[in-house]
């Protein structure tokens, strides 16, 4: 079964964004919508939770 890729509803219609999906083991995969057959970044559930927590906490603010 193929898993569906999702992108932000705020990204508009252009293929110029990050797409994400959650797979069966709970991990999260990301890809570039401009290159759907290109490389995929994969994160374990704990890695993804740490990233989201850091983003919400301002850890990556410039």
Predicted regions and their residues:
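Positively charged, low-complexity terminal tracts
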Residues: 1-62
């Amino acid at each position: 079964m193929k898993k569906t890729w999702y992108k932000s509803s705020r990204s508009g219609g252009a293929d110029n964004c990050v797409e994400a999906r959650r797979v069966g083991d709970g991990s999260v995969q990301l890809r570039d919508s401009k290159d759907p057959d290109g490389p995929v970044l994969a994160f374990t559930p704990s890695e993804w939770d740490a990233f989201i927590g850091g983003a919400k906490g301002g850890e990556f603010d410039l």
